[in-house]
Amino acid sequence: MDEKDLATQPQETGQDPRLPGQDAHPRGAQGAEAQAAEGPLAAHAQGAPLKSLKGDSAFRRLRQGRTGRGRYVTVRWLPAPELRVGIVVSKKVGKTVVRNRVKRRLREILRRLHLPRAHLLLVATPEAREAGFAELFQDLTRALKKSGLVQ
């Protein structure tokens, strides 16, 4: 019997191989999400999406805010009634696919952190394209501490 024929052979239990077994979670992928939601990051694992910082005036106001710099990210923030985030990744970082990857990683890191209410601006440096998720996480956390937003 060839390996390619193995997938088409019915299982010996008499159950259709395309149907989940009795031990499978009845709601599919939500079981995996529920497991990921356990632990110290549980509040943000299934939290609402981040609100975007919009408008040129909001970005200009942040120039007067507190600043923290890291190797991959510069952080600027001002206290505000709600958390809003602006992420800037210039074309110096790379082509669109690379810039979007950096933005997605930064957004996910922010979702995992417990941040106070503030208007927050993240500016990625060109070196951010080479950084992995863990490196970005450490660098952003360090920059947020330097800026005084988190302890």
From Swiss-Prot:
Name of this chain's protein: Ribonuclease P protein component
Family from the record: Belongs to the RnpA family.
Bias (Low complexity): 28-48
Origin: domain of life: Bacteria
EC number: 3.1.26.5
Assigned GO CC terms: ribonuclease P complex
Organism field: Thermus oshimai
Note: The open reading frame (ORF) for this protein entirely encompasses the ORF for the 50S ribosomal protein L34 (rpmH). The two start codons are separated by four nucleotides.
Function: RNaseP catalyzes the removal of the 5'-leader sequence from pre-tRNA to produce the mature 5'-terminus. It can also cleave other RNA substrates such as 4.5S RNA. The protein component plays an auxiliary but essential role in vivo by binding to the 5'-leader sequence and broadening the substrate specificity of the ribozyme.
HAMAP family linked: RNase_P (MF_00227)
Self-association state and partner proteins as the record states: Consists of a catalytic RNA component (M1 or rnpB) and a protein subunit.
UniProt keywords, alphabetically: Endonuclease, Hydrolase, Nuclease, RNA-binding, tRNA processing
